[in-house]
Design a protein with these regions (language model features):
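Residues at the starts of beta-strands that form the adenosine-phosphate
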Residues: 156, 178-179
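Aromatic pocket-lining residues of Rossmann-like dinucleotide-binding sites
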Residues: 173
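Phosphate-binding beta-alpha-beta segment of Rossmann-like dinucleotide-binding domains, i.e.
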Residues: 83, 89-156
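An N-terminal-biased, well-structured beta-alpha scaffold segment characteristic
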Residues: 1-89
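Rossmann-like adenosine-cofactor binding region
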Residues: 181, 185-225
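N-terminal Rossmann-fold NAD(P) dinucleotide-binding loop
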Residues: 166-167
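Glycine-rich Rossmann-fold phosphate-binding loop(s) that bind the pyrophosphate
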Residues: 162-163
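Hydrophobic Val/Ile/Leu positions in short beta-strands of Rossmann-like dinucleotide-binding domains
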Residues: 5, 157-159
């Protein structure tokens, strides 16, 4: 068995791959001509495959895409090829969910505005310095500063697509005590961490009720509208 990798991975990753591969021959191709030469008798490939590389791969049985999305990876010859094509589905769910909540917290607490103000040495709260609550006003006073910021525990998060990424985002939302509503074309039964599960036809309801909306659907002709 022979595995070709292109673009080449760093030495640390190559060492781990070699350990896992056992007796398999590993070729870490630094350029496309080297990859083309090695693919002539290769059984497996990891990385970014091109039509010219596939054309010489007579024994190719398995192609591993290094990303979860495939829209920038596949091409007609690969679609027609009998090899098995796999992706990194589920591998990036936690990273993407963390990134989503970085944005949610940023906009909820106006961090994007505070950073701009900081660059100008302005430290006034969003809502105005005059809106600061004095002790005399009492704890029930709602100021312009309060209204300019969101408590995400009072917010609704809409999730479009309940794949591995969408479910991980919903799990984090529940940890922040957010209400989660979702739409998915496949998930018909109530999903964990989702308060309301809607059909695709009910997408307008999700958009109407959500303070934040996350599109976690794959990029396909059906979702590009």
């Amino acid at each position: 068995m022979k595995l070709v990798i292109h673009p080449a991975v760093d030495q640390a990753r190559l060492t781990e791959i070699t350990k896992a591969a056992g007796t398999m021959t590993i070729v870490n191709a630094t350029d496309e001509p080297s990859a083309v030469l090695a693919l002539s008798d290769a059984n497996a490939f990891f990385g970014k495959l091109t039509p010219s590389m596939l054309a010489v791969a007579q024994n190719l049985e398995w192609v591993q895409c290094p990303t979860a999305s495939l829209e920038h990876f596949v091409f007609p010859e690969l679609i027609e090829h009998p090899c098995v094509l796999t992706n990194m589905r589920g591998l990036y769910s936690d990273v993407i969910a963390d990134h989503v909540f970085a944005y949610i917290l940023c906009f909820a607490r106006n961090l994007h505005l505070y950073l701009r103000q900081q660059m100008r040495s302005v430290y006034e709260p969003i809502g105005g310095e005059a809106a600061r609550t004095a002790f005399a006003t009492g704890p029930d006073h709602i100021s312009a500063i309060d209204r300019a910021h969101l408590d995400i525990a009072d917010c609704t998060l809409g999730v479009v697509g309940l794949g591995s990424i969408g479910r991980e985002i919903a799990r984090r939302a529940c940890a922040f005590d957010m209400r989660v509503i979702a739409v998915d074309p496949v998930q018909m039964e109530q999903a964990p961490n989702v308060s309301v599960l809607l059909s695709l036809e009910e997408l307008p309801r999700l958009l109407n009720e959500s303070d934040f909306v996350v599109i976690a659907a794959p990029h396909t002709p059906d979702t590009e509208r």
